[in-house]
Structure formats: structure tokens, C-alpha cells
Design a protein with these regions (language model features):
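Charged active-site motifs of nucleotide-sugar-dependent glycosyltransferases
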Residues: 3, 219-224
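Membrane-proximal helix-turn-helix segments that form the acceptor-binding/catalytic region
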Residues: 113-116, 120-124, 137-140, 152-182
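Acidic anion/phosphate-binding donor-loop and adjacent secondary structure
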Residues: 194, 207-221
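N-terminal subdomain of nucleotide-sugar transferases
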Residues: 1-59, 181
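Conserved small/polar residues in nucleotide/adenosyl-binding loops
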Residues: 230-237
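A conserved catalytic-core segment of Leloir-type glycosyltransferases
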Residues: 35-97
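An aromatic- and histidine-rich active-site surface loop
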Residues: 81-90, 105-125, 131-145
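Carbohydrate-associated surface elements
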Residues: 188, 206
Length: 241
């Protein structure tokens, strides 16, 4: 049986239905999928579970508003200095790679993490390496890609954000350069990412043939309809739409 290792920033029952549907289709085609992802407490896409063996790495345990922010800052500090988040992902993947004969590694993210964990694993194993970027930092008008505010002085926030953005882009682009293939969600994304890897493929987001399919309706009138897809980001809730 063909086996695939997926390393991603989030996975159902939390967000990232793109990877959830991929696993659903791959299992139908006879593939066995292993997913290593960050633990996120959310059940929005619970209906997409059960199609892969999922291993979650938990970074955050605090429950209070203030303690959550402090913990987030601490994890970010450890990650910047020591690559903390990447090392935990790598440590979770190593025993899986040793006991399974994977055909390739796929890393999906909306920003950079966990590309910097998937890259050395792909290089070390010499497995085909595919990167899937659901969103890219360049598409944001401001700093919406950062999940928390730093809450320091305004000038210091601006300095930290600028350095943080530059660091994320550098790490992402370094990973793209060694990927065998890159997939993304729109023609514009393709053109941006081709600067770092010439083999970029377009796979549109938000389409599932089980939900959207042609249906014949008997009617005496000619009706024009339109279909729209609303992208729900991980930090948003439906009532905000």
C-alpha cells in the first residue's frame, strides 16, 4: 500500500478542510495517510476525520486570557531562538518515518510553520517533497497573518512585526527552493511563488464534488444563478461573516 506523510499547521476536526478532503480522496484511491499537526481545540470540521492516522503536537495548555498570551509569547520566544516548534514536530515524525515506508512528504500551511520542520526531514530521507500553500504572507494588506498582537509600544510592535515578517518569508522561501513541487490556490499565488520554485501548480480551494455537482431541474423558466465561496479563516467564526 502507498503511504504518504502529511505535515501541516492544522487539520480536522480543526481547520484546514483542504487537507481533510485530500485525505478523504487519497484513502479512496488506496493510499494510507499519516498526519502530524499542531493540536488545536476546535471541532468545526469533525466530519472530515477518520481518513488518516493523526498525531497532534500540543504547544499551548493555558486557559486564562492573560496566561494564554504569556504562553504564546514564551513559545514564540523559544521558537525564534531554538526552533522549538519545529523540533517537536520533527521528533514526532522521526519514529513514524523509521517504521513506515512513505512515498513522499507533503507539507501544507497558510504561513511558514511547519515548513521548516518538513524541509530537513525531506532532505534527510530523500523523499519527494511537496509544499502546499493555502495562503501566503504577501496577500495580507497588514499583519492579519499574525494570530496575536505583541502589545508593546507602537514603534516596537512595528519593528518586531517587520523583523518577524522578514524571517518568516526567508524561511518559507528556503523551503520552497528544495521542494519538488509547490501547489497553491490561485493564479496570482502561482505567479508570486514561481519566483522561488518554477514547478508551481494550481489547485483551487473550496471545491468538493460531493457538495457541488450539476443537477437537472425541470422548470418552465430560465433562471440565472450564481455560486459564491466564502473563505473562513481559522481565527474567524461564522457569525462574523
Amino acid at each position: 500500500m502507498n503511504k504518504l506523510l502529511i505535515i501541516c499547521d492544522m487539520f480536522p476536526p480543526a481547520f484546514a478542510p483542504r487537507m481533510g478532503y485530500l485525505c478523504k480522496y487519497l484513502t479512496r484511491m488506496g493510499w494510507e495517510v499519516t498526519v502530524v499537526t499542531e493540536y488545536i481545540e476546535d471541532n468545526t470540521f469533525e466530519f472530515l476525520t477518520g481518513y488518516a492516522d493523526v498525531y497532534c503536537v500540543r504547544y499551548y495548555k493555558a486557559s486564562g486570557k492573560i496566561s494564554k498570551h504569556i504562553e504564546w509569547m514564551w513559545v514564540m520566544f523559544l521558537d525564534i531562538l531554538f526552533g522549538y516548534k519545529d523540533m517537536k514536530i520533527i521528533n514526532a515524525c522521526i519514529p513514524l518515518i523509521k517504521t513506515n515506508q512513505y512515498k513522499g512528504i507533503l507539507c501544507s500551511t497558510y504561513r511558514t510553520f511547519p515548513l521548516t520542520a518538513a524541509k530537513p526531514l525531506a532532505i534527510h530521507t530523500n523523499l519527494p517533497f511537496v509544499v502546499d500553500l493555502r495562503d501566503i504572507i504577501e496577500q495580507y494588506a497588514s499583519n492579519e497573518y499574525i494570530s496575536h498582537k505583541f502589545h508593546t509600544f507602537s514603534w516596537l510592535d512595528a519593528f518586531i512585526t517587520k523583523r518577524f515578517r522578514k524571517r518568516l518569508l526567508r524561511k518559507r522561501n528556503n523551503a520552497l527552493e528544495v521542494a519538488d513541487c509547490v501547489t497553491t490556490v490561485s493564479p496570482w499565488h502561482v505567479e508570486v511563488l514561481k519566483q522561488y520554485n518554477p514547478n508551481v501548480k494550481l489547485i483551487y480551494n473550496g471545491f468538493d464534488p460531493e457538495l457541488f455537482y450539476p443537477q437537472q431541474i425541470k422548470t418552465s423558466r430560465f433562471i440565472i444563478t450564481s455560486v459564491s465561496y466564502t473563505h473562513l479563516r481559522a481565527h474567524e467564526t461564522p457569525e462574523h461573516l
